[in-house]
Design a protein with these regions (language model features):
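A general structural signal for short secondary-structure boundary/capping elements
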Residues: 54, 88-89, 98-106
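An amphipathic, aromatic/His-enriched active-site/gating alpha helix that lines ligand/cofactor pockets
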Residues: 17-39, 48, 57-96
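Short, solvent-exposed loop/turn elements at beta->coil junctions and helix N-caps
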Residues: 42-44
Length: 107
């Protein structure tokens, strides 16, 4: 059963374009190496601003654990991605979620 890593971030005012560039250029390509699927990526337009949500899909809990460990050790993640985004994030919420069998599955 697919597992979803649902992440909500509050960014510093005006930091959304810079954060999106870091994800596009480094963050997503690193996750791609470990077969992590981008299931959704959104940013606020109306209402509470400076919010981004990304949803990453994994085949199962074992894939989530394995990929999470590999991403954390990846040199591009540690040396290129984290330094770019650390100063942009004000708050973070993360949920690991499951999807029922009637919902679309990424794998």
């Amino acid at each position: 059963m697919a597992v979803y890593d649902f992440r909500m971030y509050t960014l510093k005012p005006g930091a959304t374009p810079e954060y999106m560039a870091a994800v596009r250029e480094v963050g997503k390509p690193v996750r791609d190496k470990y077969d992590v699927k981008l299931a959704g990526w959104y940013y606020s337009d109306v209402g509470e601003l400076n919010q981004v949500v990304h949803i990453w899909a994994y085949r199962d809990h074992a894939h989530w654990e394995e990929a999470k460990a590999k991403v954390a050790q990846d040199p591009d993640w540690r040396e290129k991605y984290l330094p770019r985004v650390r100063g942009l994030i004000v708050a973070q919420k993360t949920y690991v979620m499951l999807s029922p069998d009637f919902a679309p599955q990424p794998f």
